[in-house]
Amino acid sequence: TTVLDKSFRLPNKIANFAKSIVKRIDRRYEKEWSSRDDEGLLEYHTKFDYINMSKGEWLVLARTHYLLQPIEAQCRREGWFYSKNNVPSVRKSLITSIQDWEKLRKGESISSAAVRKMYQFFKSDGNVTKKGRGLKNVTEYETFSLQNLQNDYGLRTSGIWHEAFDNLSIYEREYMIALLRRGEKLTEEPRVRLSTIHAAKGKECQHVVLLTDLSRKAWTQMQVHENDELRTFYV
């Protein structure tokens, strides 16, 4: 068996931080290994607000789910595109429907499947009539222009998406507007990922934020089984 003695992922400062955790574990077989050649960057912050995640890829790790809640709230306030436990902060169907709506406004046509998906974001008897919303007798092979939908399928608007989609909550609408103003790339994977430590095992990222807070339950367990908690943070 060959034991690799060099990490090509961890820069020196991060490796030293990891070793400072693992050396506190009792009765552990000592493994000799070295880091990458570069130093890397390790910073300590007393508040999450001090971390600027407006650019680049980020992985935020917490011991338990509830510790991610205030981080998620800040991501929404700032207009950062994120995922929490692998679930994106914006529904893919909404992103696609906004793109399809803008196609209609430019004079293009879209499929009946795209129309059905898009119509869920209009209130029945709001910006589309109740009768038109049903799209009766429409086949999967048909395509529709904005004028078709206005003339025959109850559409009552041609405004920009955040005015037209009247079935969106204010909460979701304002967040989407903030994302677009920031220039977030919504057709790509979210650049900020929020995860528990356990769920993120093996993942890598350009920037990693490790929340060192513990729940009362985890703190109590640590008083009895400290090694288990140390292994969690080390991994």
PLM region spans:
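The feature marks helicase ATPase cores and/or their adjacent C-terminal helical subdomains
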Residues: T1-V235
